[in-house]
Amino acid sequence: MKGILGKKVGMSQLFTTEGIAISVSIIEVPENIVTKIITKEKNSYNAIQLAAFDKKQSRFLKPEIGHFAKANTKPKRFIKEFRDFQGYKLGQTVDVSIFSPGEFVDVTGTSKGKGFAGTIKRYNQAIGPRSHGGGGGSKPIRQTGSLGDISGNKVVKGMTMPGRLGHEKVTKQSLEIIKVDKENNLLVLKGSVPGPKKSFLVIKSAIKKPNPKNPVSLFVPNSDKEVKNE
């Protein structure tokens, strides 16, 4: 099991040797620091705490500064706990080289917030009839409709109603690693990842392994060689 913290840079595209364009997400993955070791003897489970992206020390309280000082590192902005991770030491660095092209990962982040939205946009409900008494503006066409049986005297839990859309924890599963750039600390994944640019992401080894398929052969300009993800 592998895991690391990163930040979304944006999206781009790469071309295969057959000329097919592949949409890719570029993720910045700096050196992660192990800032805490959690053992089963003390906390009833095994885990490690990773931290990344420096932040001004003046923004932290003294106990927080002392927590990072134990790992001999500067205060970090993004901190996450990874369960069932063993074999790490306090203060150890983890970088993008733990992954290799062809592997599959799960990426967790916070989706883009879209503000207040109605049920048609939020839950993909159908629009009401525009004739036979359903006209008269957008209200009767786009309204929520029935909220349940009147004898219950309540709105049942889970009823689809208008509210805030987006800004939720989302996980994209089984994304293929197309390229690992160790020099620039970048990870290139096939497809999209949650959240806007500069949003923080948690990257872990994929739980659901996809069916084996042919590796992606990338086209490299000014070169006769193929780059295969094996």
UniProtKB/Swiss-Prot annotation:
Top-level taxonomy: Bacteria, Bacillati, Mycoplasmatota, Mycoplasmoidales, Metamycoplasmataceae
Protein name stated in the entry: Large ribosomal subunit protein uL3
UniProt family annotation: Belongs to the universal ribosomal protein uL3 family.
PANTHER family found in the cross-reference section: 50S RIBOSOMAL PROTEIN L3, LARGE RIBOSOMAL SUBUNIT PROTEIN UL3C
Keywords, sorted A to Z: Ribonucleoprotein, Ribosomal protein, RNA-binding, rRNA-binding
Origin superkingdom: Bacteria
Gene (name only): rplC
GO biological process per UniProt: translation
UniProt source species: Mesomycoplasma hyopneumoniae (strain 232) (Mycoplasma hyopneumoniae)
Main function: One of the primary rRNA binding proteins, it binds directly near the 3'-end of the 23S rRNA, where it nucleates assembly of the 50S subunit.
Entry-linked PROSITE patterns: RIBOSOMAL_L3 (PS00474)
Region listing for Disordered, in residue ranges: 125-149, 210-230
GO MF: rRNA binding; structural constituent of ribosome
InterPro entries linked: Ribosomal_uL3, Ribosomal_uL3_bac/org-type, Ribosomal_uL3_CS, Transl_B-barrel_sf
Coiled coil: none
GO cellular component, one term: cytosolic large ribosomal subunit
Subunit comment: Part of the 50S ribosomal subunit. Forms a cluster with proteins L14 and L19.
